Amino acid sequence: MKRPSGRAADQLRSIRITRNYTKHAEGSVLVEFGDTKVICTVSVESGVPRFLKGQGQGWLTAEYGMLPRATGERNQREASRGKQGGRTLEIQRLIGRSLRAALDMSKLGENTLYVDCDVIQADGGTRTASITGAMVALIDALKVLKKRGSLKGEPLKQMIAAVSVGIYQGEPVLDLDYLEDSAAETDLNVVMTNAGGFIEVQGTAEGAPFQPEEFNAMLALAQKGMNEIFELQKAALVD
């Protein structure tokens, strides 16, 4: 089996994490997984949703979108259609769930963190790139809150990151690009903590059912890739 990119089965794409990419947000990152590029910002607002008022804890929510020409053909803006699509809603909920798992909300004070992930170029793995980049932007936003004296302690419990794995031409592969993803028999998106715990595993057999041993092989690939991604996050956060 030869991957279209020429990468080994267990090889990540080239990953770059550029901090402070925009001027105004408390945390901002440009994350690049190969040709997939996502701008991730984290904005802080005082106050929490109504269901949390008076409880002394914070909240985090996420939104996800793509530029119309992030893909090979132009897509209509969801705003012009008047509603978000099911895929968009699914992805932004995944991003929010994943990042909330990194935090102790009781230490945030009554502040809301708004995570915005905007795909400027898509070549597969946009949701996993979004989670990975947003984690770094989130840490920068928490530093701002700490300087303001808005925190009630250390809210960061753990780092998180995400990566895709799949079965391509009968073999498990790591970090699928669009050509692989569109032809894969199976596609998994895996979210993990830096302590090795799983937060979420989303999987679909598109071509043929996958066997337990293939599932375990994909998880092992994800763990290997994740270890490398956590090191890249750590390196990006060095001031």
UniProtKB/Swiss-Prot annotation:
Signal peptide: none annotated. Phosphate binds at residues 87, 125-127. The keyword tRNA-binding applies. It catalyses: tRNA(n+1) + phosphate = tRNA(n) + a ribonucleoside 5'-diphosphate. Gene3D superfamilies: GHMP Kinase, N-terminal domain. Keywords: Nucleotidyltransferase, RNA-binding, rRNA processing, Transferase, tRNA processing, tRNA-binding. One of its GO terms (molecular function) is tRNA nucleotidyltransferase activity. Its EC number is 2.7.7.56. InterPro entries: ExoRNase_PH_dom1, ExoRNase_PH_dom2, ExoRNase_PH_dom2_sf, PNPase/RNase_PH_dom_sf, Ribosomal_Su5_D2-typ_SF, RNase_PH, RNase_PH_bac-type, RNase_PH_CS. The keyword Repressor does not apply. GO terms for biological process: rRNA catabolic process; rRNA processing; tRNA processing. Belongs to the RNase PH family. Homohexameric ring arranged as a trimer of dimers. NCBIfam families: RNasePH. Phosphorolytic 3'-5' exoribonuclease that plays an important role in tRNA 3'-end maturation. Removes nucleotide residues following the 3'-CCA terminus of tRNAs; can also add nucleotides to the ends of RNA molecules by using nucleoside diphosphates as substrates, but this may not be physiologically important. Probably plays a role in initiation of 16S rRNA degradation (leading to ribosome degradation) during starvation. This is Ribonuclease PH. It comes from Ectopseudomonas mendocina (strain ymp) (Pseudomonas mendocina). The lineage of its organism: Bacteria, Pseudomonadati, Pseudomonadota, Gammaproteobacteria, Pseudomonadales.
